[in-house]
């Protein structure tokens, strides 16, 4: 079913054309990513589709009964309600129905036989409608979203207005997810999410019953969630089938194909023109030359494929090599003034050439640890020891090292006054600051431009140990790839914090998982880390199961169970645990089937066959309904108490 059509849409800001003849189609259960460079017009397009911006030309066609939900970047809720109360406002209509049902129940209790039948019919209709709209499920849905987005540990009395900006944005996302619109429009939904929350959101969106339109710079997320990609480049859009990786492959293959066709035509043109030039003046060949010239005139000459827009181009060098041991942290305890310790007795070591990713939930203290390592914060106790010849370069995710009042050129030149202006300008050019861009004040730059400027300063430092705090924040997808390639070739040592799992996978040789009291080390990339975490969880589950089997029967608070009661309780407990295992196995199979179906939808032979696509969507719909029912049963069984 068609949910939305965008036809020949154009948008300008002043003399600048941002979008030109954009075409986009959204069908039910489509998962569409809009990608492109920073400033390409992705967010502008989402705002137009959501009805928050006007446009000059084109049309947007949407059936009247289709609902849309839009989450803009940096959107946050501000309310005096508690976190849970705010999310429950989504279901005010169900609470009103529930109240009406309670009133009718009281009426039925007091009604005479003549009225009762009529009231019961009305009550049955209302109860069925309440059930169909999720009346018996919505509180569980709220709990699930609160848990998934990392709010389960908050006190029930926590008010929305007391949350940080990032937490308010997360809550706004949760509220939007609960509304279940037919078309979910998300602009950078992965901002402010830690890795656990990102994983939960991926699973949630994979099973979402409506269509999704996303702008995101998280490649791992896009690979997991989307099945179509629209690239916005040079104000125009182009559609690709499959996830983000498939889009990259198709784009590269199309460019190579177009380039070969262009070069072949250019060779043909050159040969024809050469024949005309050599033979036009000769009487014996004039007619043939004129024929070739007409052939040239009739030819539809191809434009040279443009390929990608200009990319940043940089690399990180070092002035001198460090000793083998680069950093040793021993029993480090860190706290803020008048606060309990954030980190306690943390220890780890880095050697030359390692690339270590520091991961952990939001608020655990990752950035605090990095700031302590560079001496911006002082530890309460413990030691930080650097090896011989270690020089440290630090990248701050908030770009606090930049001076907002300076010009871009001066920001670098003041730091390295010994370098000639030409070299400074060349360096800035490598980071896409050209011409008058270098004369802009720093405060006028976008987040992505500030990130590139901070990286330019870091490059000139030539330190042999780089400590990076969220270096991919604000960078577009292309700039992330350039940064990755530069860091892969970097001859020094790396310690970095990042929520970008694709980035971690490419860069990390070791993952350090930070908790409040220690660091757990994993010798591999992100995929290795997640594999080991899964193994650990499965092992813990097995151990808990064994403990449960060994544990003596629970004693009732008022009296001991009789032998028969004990026997019956054990029987039911075994049945409950067996059913949990059955559900978990079935859920895994269903999720694999959904994933397999999503992969099929990326196959050209399938997505070009409309009947096959409809059949797969119908199968996924059925699988998702079954999955929802099983997960609901699993939750009930898991929380069941004697």
UniProtKB/Swiss-Prot annotation:
InterPro entries: AAA+_ATPase, ABC_tran_C, ABC_tran_Xtn, ABC_transporter-like_ATP-bd, ABC_transporter-like_CS, ABCF_ATPase, P-loop_NTPase, Val-tRNA_synth_C_sf. ATP 2 binds at residues 360-367. Residues 541-567 are annotated as: Disordered. The keyword 4Fe-4S does not apply. The keyword ATP-binding applies. It holds the Pfam family ABC_tran. Disulfide bonds: none annotated. Keywords: ATP-binding, Nucleotide-binding, Repeat. GO terms for molecular function: ATP binding; ATP hydrolysis activity; DNA binding. ATP 1 binds at residues 36-43. Residues 4-259, 327-541 form the ABC transporter domain. Signal peptide: none annotated. It comes from the Bacteria. Residues 541-550, 557-567 have a biased composition (Basic and acidic residues). SMART domains: AAA. Belongs to the ABC transporter superfamily. ABCF family. YdiF subfamily. This is Putative ATP-binding protein YdiF. It comes from Bacillus subtilis (strain 168). The gene is ydiF.
């Amino acid at each position: 079913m068609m949910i939305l059509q965008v036809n020949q849409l154009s948008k300008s800001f002043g003399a600048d054309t941002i979008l030109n003849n954009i075409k986009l189609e959204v069908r039910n259960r489509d998962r569409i990513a809009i990608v492109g460079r920073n400033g390409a017009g992705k967010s502008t397009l989402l705002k137009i589709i959501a009805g928050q911006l006007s446009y000059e030309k084109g049309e947007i066609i949407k059936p009247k009964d289709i609902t849309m939900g839009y989450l803009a970047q940096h959107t946050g809720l501000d309310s005096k309600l508690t976190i849970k109360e705010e999310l429950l406002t989504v279901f005010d209509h169900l609470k009103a129905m529930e109240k009406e049902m309670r009133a009718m129940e009281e009426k039925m209790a007091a009604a005479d036989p003549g009225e009762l039948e009529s009231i019961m019919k009305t009550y049955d209709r209302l109860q069925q409608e309440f059930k169909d709209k999720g009346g018996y499920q919505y509180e569980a849905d709220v709990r699930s979203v609160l848990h998934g987005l990392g709010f389960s540990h908050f006190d029930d009395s926590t008010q929305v207005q007391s949350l940080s900006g990032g937490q308010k944005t997360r809550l706004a996302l949760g509220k939007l997810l609960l509304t279940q619109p037919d078309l979910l429009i998300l602009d950078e939904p992965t901002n402010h999410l830690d890795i656990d929350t990102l994983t939960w959101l991926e699973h949630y969106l994979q099973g979402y019953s409506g269509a999704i339109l996303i702008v995101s710079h998280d490649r791992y997320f896009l690979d997991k969630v989307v099945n179509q990609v629209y690239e916005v480049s040079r104000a125009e859009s182009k559609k690709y089938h499959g996830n983000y990786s498939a889009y990259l492959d198709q784009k590269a293959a199309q460019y190579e194909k177009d380039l070969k066709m262009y070069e072949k035509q250019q060779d043909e043109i050159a040969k024809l023109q050469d024949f005309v030039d050599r033979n036009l003046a000769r009487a014996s060949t004039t007619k043939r030359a004129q024929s070739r010239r007409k052939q040239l005139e009739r030819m539809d000459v191809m434009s040279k494929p443009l390929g990608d827009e200009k990319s940043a181009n940089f690399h990180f060098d070092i002035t001198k090599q460090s000793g083998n041991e680069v950093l040793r942290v021993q029993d480090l305890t860190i706290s803020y003034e008048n606060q309990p310790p954030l980190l306690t007795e943390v220890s780890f070591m880095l050697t030359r050439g390692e690339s270590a990713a520091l991961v952990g939930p939001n608020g655990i203290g990752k950035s605090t640890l990095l700031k302590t390592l560079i001496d911006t914060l002082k530890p309460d106790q413990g030691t930080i020891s650097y090896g011989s010849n270690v020089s440290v370069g630090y990248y701050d995710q908030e770009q606090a090292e930049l001076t907002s009042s300076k010009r871009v050129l001066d920001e670098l030149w003041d730091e390295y006054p010994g370098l000639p202006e030409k070299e400074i300008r060349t360096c800035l050019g490598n980071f896409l600051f050209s011409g008058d861009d270098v004369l802009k004040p720093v405060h006028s730059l976008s987040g992505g431009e500030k990130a590139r400027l901070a990286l330019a300063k870091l490059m000139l430092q030539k330190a042999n140990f780089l400590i990076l705090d969220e270096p991919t924040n604000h960078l577009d997808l292309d700039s992330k790839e350039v940064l990755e390639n530069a860091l892969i070739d970097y001859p020094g040592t790396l310690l970095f914090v990042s929520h970008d799992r694709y980035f971690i996978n490419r860069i990390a040789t070791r993952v350090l998982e930070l908790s409040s009291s220690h660091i757990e080390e994993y010798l591999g990339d992100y995929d290795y880390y997640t594999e080991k975490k899964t193994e650990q969880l499965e092992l813990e589950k097995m151990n808990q199961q064994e403990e449960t089997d060994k544990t003596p029967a629970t004693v009732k608070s008022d009296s001991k169970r009789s032998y028969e009661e004990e026997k019956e309780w054990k029987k039911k407990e075994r049945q409950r645990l067996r059913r949990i295992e059955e559900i978990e196995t079935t859920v895994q199979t269903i999720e694999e089937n959904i994933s397999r179906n999503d992969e099929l939808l990326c196959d050209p032979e399938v997505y070009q066959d409309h009947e096959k696509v409809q059949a797969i969507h119908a199968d996924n719909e059925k699988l998702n309904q079954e999955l929802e029912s099983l997960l609901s049963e699993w939750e009930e069984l898991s929380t069941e108490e004697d």
